[in-house]
């Protein structure tokens, strides 16, 4: 008796299963995993009745096994159905820890922004500052307040515009360090040393340049480093840090505003050295953006950076697939030539709907600043004083605390619900709150009841802003754009933010204050903010695409495929579904690694789902939930543990489908590391397939054509990669395992293409 028969007999005795040694539907006696031939370790057949049988083929590789379902009863035309599923044990789980820690740490740049913004609100109301810094030694005039507050934003506007030239030339990481340790610190030193209004303004302009660079590069760095399922929350942490900075500045200023000396303003300003030093020194230990390395064709460094950020070994197939996807998309875009600042405003084949994308980013940044939020944070203390509110400092502090608290649910909602719903809901609530404040302020005047109502709705407005527009705007404006122009577009959006900020800060005192050459609108200004909120909601509805859950590269495909923003959520789901609905006959990861596959009616998470099969982990699955045409099986992984599988597919067919062990597409990156490309090619490469099926939302298109389309996409990518990679990498820090010499980019891509051809050629 051979080993296989012994194995079968033992399994019959232990498992009370009917042994079977007829695997006629299995082609050959070996299974192929990553093209290494391995004999069967054991096999058995479980017969549930006379017409159905379920066969499991175990391989000597403990990480893989194949399950097949066979209907022994011929259909009407004599056909027999066999469904084959090749499963593997879970790959090592990705670690989100480093991506989260890196994203939150660089958000300290937002803390600097918020701290400096909130500081000026308190400093201009300090008794010592009014007496010794104000030119007339008693108070600041409307024009002086306007210049002192707004000129920080003037500096940030120019800082944001120069940011892409520095970050694309020297990297995201050095740019953040330089702007923090050098530019911002110089401006801060001038503010600390100032004994008059002029030097204080000059210092704020220079500090503003540093903050402007930070505001353009930090969200960009966060977007390029984060995993797609965490990107929204991580970028939103930038806004959360801004709110914390505002709160801390208010607390510090309350502690020093009554001091009768220069320390009243120098202490809160000087503390900015601490925050800037933390960011500058900490950046030394963080990796550069992997997409920047791809931009510079330093692929080995990009792989190392991804390894650090994803918590995966450098040879992990998921990490390498992500690297290939980034490289493919960038090379496709770069094949159209170098990009300039004007390309940010040009739609082309490699940058679909680019005009709409840049308009969207600029518009939402502008409406964020014109929402009324900075009026409260810049002039809140003075406004509360003028409307009869007692202890305006305390009310201002409470508003900052609300801002911090409600930024936290916003970090959750942006990835859970999506960008569009959050922006739309937030805009509506903000509009209502602003209009109520205006109506109450105009109709009731300076009464106690009116003050309480206004404070309550101001807090409601701040809560809505913090949870929605505060963070989501930075998320959208950082992720909308192709890699070739991403830094430039992000900088333009940040510059738009600061330009509107500057304009609002400059003109608001003239609109609100009472006196000559002013409009004396008072609470009526909230009618303006409320009206702008309504316009913002309309713009979001018709311009903002839903990008939740997509990689930065898949967002390009979204804009290429989705005809408009209104139905972009539908197309977003299509793209995400296509990424998961690859043929079930190919290698798949277990449910621990596929968390976004969706839910069935019974609320069990499927491993993979398509129109024909729902392969579900049924650990703990209630027996009464199994339908009559469902088939359940327990697969032994060889270590004593079982994986419970249920297949809801009917076991009849009109054509014979023999079980095959399909080859897993295997790509060698030229450094001895393998990559499974089983599900799809790089998304930005235009597929050879027709789009009619895609546009008709026929899910069978994905199921039946994914393998073919994936191969076409990857093959197209390989050809483009070879043609476009004429430059060489200067990186010699990484030596491939099979070659001690550093390889050029062309060698790297040649190996990639040749290995791909080797493993995807007809067998």
Curated annotation (Swiss-Prot):
Glycan-linked positions: 136, 385
Known role: Low-affinity high glucose sensor that is part of the sensor/receptor-repressor (SSR) glucose-signaling pathway, which detects extracellular glucose and induces expression of glucose transporters that bring glucose into the cell. The transporter-like sensor generates an intracellular signal in the presence of high levels of glucose to promote high glucose-induced expression of HXT1.
Q: Where are the compositionally biased (Low complexity) regions? A: 725-737
Topological domain (Extracellular) residues are: 121-144, 197, 253-266, 379-393, 443-452, 513-524
Which InterPro entries does the entry link to? MFS_dom (IPR020846), MFS_sugar_transport-like (IPR005828), MFS_Sugar_Transporters (IPR050360), MFS_trans_sf (IPR036259), Sugar/inositol_transpt (IPR003663), Sugar_transporter_CS (IPR005829)
> Is Transport given among the entry's keywords?
yes
Kindly indicate where the leader peptide sits in this chain. none
Biased segments, Polar residues type? 738-763
Return the annotated region ranges for Disordered.
1-28, 725-763
Give the way it sits in the membrane: Multi-pass membrane protein
Membership in a protein family: Belongs to the major facilitator superfamily. Sugar transporter (TC 2.A.1.1) family.
Q: How is it modified after translation?
A: Phosphorylated in the C-terminal tail on Yck consensus sites in a yeast casein kinases YCK1 and YCK2 (Yck)-dependent manner. This phosphorylation is required for interaction with HXT corepressors MTH1 and STD1 and ultimately HXT expression.
Fetch the PROSITE patterns from UniProt: MFS, SUGAR_TRANSPORT_1, SUGAR_TRANSPORT_2
From the record, give the transmembrane residue ranges.
100-120, 145-165, 176-196, 198-218, 232-252, 267-287, 358-378, 394-414, 422-442, 453-473, 492-512, 525-545
Query: Where this protein primarily resides, as one coarse class?
Result: membrane
Where does it reside?
Cell membrane
A single Gene Ontology molecular function, please?
D-glucose binding
Q: Which GO terms describe its cellular component?
A: cell periphery; membrane; plasma membrane
Keyword set for this entry? Cell membrane, Glycoprotein, Membrane, Sugar transport, Transmembrane, Transmembrane helix, Transport
Q: Which residues lie on this side of the membrane: Cytoplasmic?
A: 1-99, 166-175, 219-231, 288-357, 415-421, 474-491, 546-763
Assembly state and interactors?
Interacts with YCK1. Interacts with MTH1 and STD1.
Q: Could you tell me which Pfam families the record lists for this protein? A: Sugar_tr
Protein's name in the database = High glucose sensor RGT2
Q: Which SUPFAM superfamilies match?
A: MFS general substrate transporter
GO biological process terms held by the UniProt record: carbohydrate transport; glucose mediated signaling pathway
